Structure formats: structure tokens, C-alpha cells
């Protein structure tokens, strides 16, 4: 099974990369992700012209999300230039290194020339710059003048105009988009202490992890549809091999993961890579490239002929469908019984059935 992927001159033996963050916060961590976890490429923690002043604690983990106020690297750029990147390049097995930098045009004028010799490509965070597309365009044009390396602009989940973002970076010379950065601002309150327990000086943090996967998928799809020539790297919510495939189907050429590994263990990188061949085979794919080249189907249906049908052999009689039905249309009589007049054909019960015993009935065309 061929799980390799190629884009913008980069060749990855598998499509999974770490996202910029604490797990790639120095050379030893990056080498672990490359050689132990087996990632297809390495993305370094974001470097800026100033080292970040980070509050503590700065990371909060819940079941399906991470909240962080960690900002970018806590180390000065000189430590990356003189120590981390040289050490990584010396001991690397040669997988692509994507150097993450942020944030403004003025930052780029300092960082790109200083880091160009280490980078196989750049990822550029716009997280704290705002939504000004004119300023974005100027930043992209500046980067293009400063390097011949491919570079990808990272879009935040709260960007109101992803199509405009994509068009702006394309016409100014970027190779692609990394979609998406964390979502926010967000907040965590401890009721017992009447306290905001994580956050910056305003009490705010940023949310990532499986919780934001559907937002990330929609952004990847939107950008690839709007600007097909741009490379898209998907990030936000990946936690399994099937998640990887979903992002590739949505339009990504590669993917990044961070939060799920922080919630479930760093061994998750190797597990996803190991699981990918069998998961591809399960869904009838022969390679990652085939997934990327698959046209995603979509059909909007207005109305369904009948309520969902029940497979009595699968039904566990758990009653979940009846308890959650917002239209009070299901009663349990051993198996679910639908009131056709009350049933709105909304689909909630089908999506929530734990044993997949319910099936839609689409209206005749």
C-alpha cells in the first residue's frame, strides 16, 4: 500500500505531520517525531522575532479539546538559528522540515532570510495579525521576494472569508494554505473557585482538537474548491486514520496533528501511520494519491418519503433514538416505532444510533 504524498516539490513517505506546538518545541522533540513517531515531515514550533511571554498554566485538556494560551516559541530566534535547527539538520534522516514563522511583514523580513537555509518549506502563521486581506497580501508578496522555497499560509478557524484569504495569498505568490489554526477566543471557568482558570491577561485561550474537526474540514473543502491550484494541508481535529482520509477527500494533500496526541498520548502518531494502510483498504482505496484525486460527491435532498427503517437484527433496543428525538416521534416497543406524522425526517436518530440499525429513505427524484 502506497501511503506517500507529494506536493510543491516535497515528498512525504506518509501524509501525517505534527502541527506547530509544544511537541516540536526543540531539536530533540522534532527528531523524536521524525524518527520514532515516523511522521512524513516535521513542522517546527512557530518562531517569531521575539520569544513569547507565556502564562502558566497555559494548556487545558478535556475529552475532545485542548485550550491553550501558549502563543509561539518561548525561545529567542537566535536559539533556533544557532542551536535547534543546526542540531536537527545534522541528526535528521532527511525528511522535509517545514519551518513555522509568524506573524507580520516586518517579522518576515527578519525571519525568512535567517531561516531559509534550514527550511525545505515555510509555514506562516497569521493568527495574531487580524483579518486584513490587504496586509495579508503585502506579507505574502514580501515572503515571495525573500525565498524561493514553497510556503504555506496558515488560516485561523475564525477567519470570516476563507475564499478571499485563499485568493489573496495565491495572487501574491504563496504555494498553499494550512487550514486551520485554533478557534477562539474561548474561556474556561471553575465554578467552585469562581475563577477563570486558564487564559491570557483577558482570560481568553484558543481551542483545538477533535472538537473543531468539522470546522476544519469545511475550511479545507471551501479553499480547495475556490482555488484548486493551491496546496491545502489539513489540520484541526485529526485523531485517527479515518480522519486523515476525510481531510484528503476534502481537498488536503497532507495533514497535521497535535491536540489529539496531547489528549491521548504521543504514540498516536505512529498508530495512525500504522493504521492507515488497512483503513485505506477498508474503504476501497489503493493509495493516498487515489484518495486525494477522488471527487467528493454531494447531494442536497429536500424531503424523505418515509421515516427511517429499523433493522431488528442490529437493534440493541437501547432506546437512544426515542430519548433524543426532538419531535417526540419515536416510541419503544421492543424496537423503535416511528409516528410518521410526527417524524420530521431530520436524521438525528440515524446519526446517533450506536449500532447503525437505522436507515434513511430518500424521496424519489
For each feature predicted by the language model, list its residue ranges.
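Glycine-rich phosphate-binding active-site loops on the catalytic face of alpha/beta enzymes
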Residues: 44-50, 123-129, 176-186, 237-238, ...
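Alpha-helix-loop-beta-strand connector modules within alpha/beta enzyme cores
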Residues: 67-93, 136-155, 199-232, 272-285
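Active-site beta->alpha loop and helix N-cap motifs at the rims of alpha/beta catalytic domains
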Residues: 63-133
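Catalytic cores of alpha/beta
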Residues: 28-32, 108-116, 159-172, 223-227, ...
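Iron-sulfur cluster-binding cysteine motifs and their immediate structural context
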Residues: 320-337, 348-364
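C-terminal helical cap(s) of enzyme catalytic domains, especially alpha/beta-barrels
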Residues: 53-67, 187-204, 248-249, 260-285
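Glycine/Thr-rich beta-alpha phosphate-binding loop at enzyme active sites
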Residues: 66-68, 124-135, 165-230, 264
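Glycine-rich, positively charged N-terminal anion/phosphate-binding segment
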Residues: 2-6, 27-91, 136
